[in-house]
Curated annotation (Swiss-Prot):
Keywords: Electron transport, Heme, Iron, Membrane, Metal-binding, Mitochondrion, Mitochondrion inner membrane, Respiratory chain, Transmembrane, Transmembrane helix, Transport, Ubiquinone. Heme b b566 binds at residues 97, 196. It comes from Cryptotis parva (North American least shrew). The lineage of its organism: Eukaryota, Metazoa, Chordata, Craniata, Vertebrata. Its cofactor is heme b. A ubiquinone binds at residue 201. This is Cytochrome b. Heme 1 (or BL or b562) is low-potential and absorbs at about 562 nm, and heme 2 (or BH or b566) is high-potential and absorbs at about 566 nm. Binds 2 heme b groups non-covalently. The chain crosses the membrane at residues 33-53, 77-98, 113-133, 178-198, 226-246, 288-308, 320-340, 347-367.
Length: 379
């Protein structure tokens, strides 16, 4: 008799995705982040669901409902901080996952990569709207500043902003719709993640060498299930330590002040995971130019496969490209730091130089270096 997991319509999908899936035998811990992102999404949906049971999306009561969750709801403080810091863990895993893809040439799976870029945009949109919901000072002013950027779009800009706001400023209508979108988008993300996996399983996983691994495949279970469980345990350990020991480490103190449209905070800045893009936005003195640079800072990922000039897929055997990759990482960390600093000398010029370097590395320097490496090797 054939095993039920291979015949049952639902079980065989799970079987071919997580049990009998042929997997390269040499994939490293950098391949753990896909499963970690899945766990992060599950944590966010579950904690978010329980928060939504007690949250009210009204400007008069939103802030106090979050306070009520933290003070009066059983383990409400735990659920709230798991959700807030879970978002940070989500983005850490996302950045590492994308970085892995860039380093090892996983972007050559075009469909998988493009769905991934779409997922990144969806997660960023969800996180932005979630940050508005507690209705603190930084929530309100962050929403005002970022939505106002759309007014830079020629002709339709100001109408578009008012349409998104549902009025002439960020108000009750804005908060209500942001809550609705923040609730629905994670399910869209889950569906997109399913499509992401579907396309990945069409080709099979890449591996550190960037070479075809058809000759050396092993079943996903038990080898990689146990490896994923280790990664998940480490993720939960880090998240738990963050939540229980310093839950406000990554947050902004201004968000403990209720939103006040009459009082602007001295430094408006988004959550840490958007600071690199915010620094790029601020480094261009023109409003429309800044908005375009902001969008392109993420959208540029979609063009990476077209800029691949190397004869090798992975950077494993390309020391010059490796150096440039780590310069890119350092540059992104610099941008993240600059995004959190006030707009004054010397931060302005550092931000501008780091922004130029970011685009130059991805669009010009790395493709040319790859061509150089092709000629350095005897093919």
């Amino acid at each position: 008799m054939t095993n039920i997991r291979k015949t049952h319509p639902l079980m065989k999908i799970i079987n071919s995705s997580f049990i009998d899936l042929p997997t390269p035998s040499n994939i490293s811990s950098w391949w753990n982040f896909g499963s970690l992102l899945g766990i992060c999404l599950i944590i966010q949906i579950l904690t978010g669901l329980f928060l939504a049971m007690h949250y009210t999306s009204d400007t008069m009561t939103a802030f106090s409902s979050v306070t009520h969750i933290c003070r009066d709801v059983n383990y409400g403080w735990l659920i709230r901080y798991l959700h807030a810091n879970g978002a940070s863990m989500f983005f850490i895993c996302l950045f590492l996952h994308v970085g892995r893809g860039l380093y090892y040439g996983s972007y050559m799976f075009m469909e998988t990569w493009n769905i991934g870029v779409l997922l990144l945009f969806a997660v960023m949109a969800t996180a932005f709207m979630g940050y508005v919901l507690p209705w603190g000072q930084m929530s309100f002013w962050g929403a005002t500043v970022i939505t106002n950027l759309l007014s830079a779009i020629p002709y339709i800009g100001s109408d578009l902003v008012q349409w998104i706001w549902g009025g002439f400023s960020v108000d009750k209508a804005t908060l209500t719709r942001f809550f609705a979108f923040h609730f629905i988008l994670p399910f869209v993300i889950a569906a997109l993640a399913g499509v992401h996996l579907l396309f990945l399983h069409e080709t099979g996983s890449n591996n550190p060498s960037g070479l075809p691994s058809d000759a050396d495949k092993i079943p996903f279970h038990p080898y990689y299930t146990i490896k994923d469980i280790l990664g998940i345990l480490l993720l939960i350990l880090v998240l738990t330590c963050l939540v229980l020991f310093s839950p406000d480490l990554l947050g902004d103190p201004d968000n403990y002040t209720p939103a006040n449209p009459l009082n602007t905070p001295p430094h408006i800045k988004p959550e840490w995971y958007f600071l690199f893009a915010y620094a790029i936005l601020r480094s261009i003195p023109n409003k429309l130019g800044g908005v375009l640079a902001l969008v392109l800072s993420i959208l540029i990922l979609a063009f990476i496969p077209l800029l691949h000039t190397s004869k090798q897929r992975s950077m494993m055997f390309r020391p010059l490209s490796q150096c440039l990759f780590w310069i890119l990482v350092a540059d992104l960390l610099t941008l993240t730091w600059i995004g959190g600093q006030p707009v004054e000398h010397p931060f302005i010029i550092i931000g501008q130089l780091a922004s130029i370097l970011y685009f130059m590395l991805l669009l010009v320097i790395m493709p040319i270096t790859s061509l150089l490496e092709n000629n350095l090797l005897k093919w």
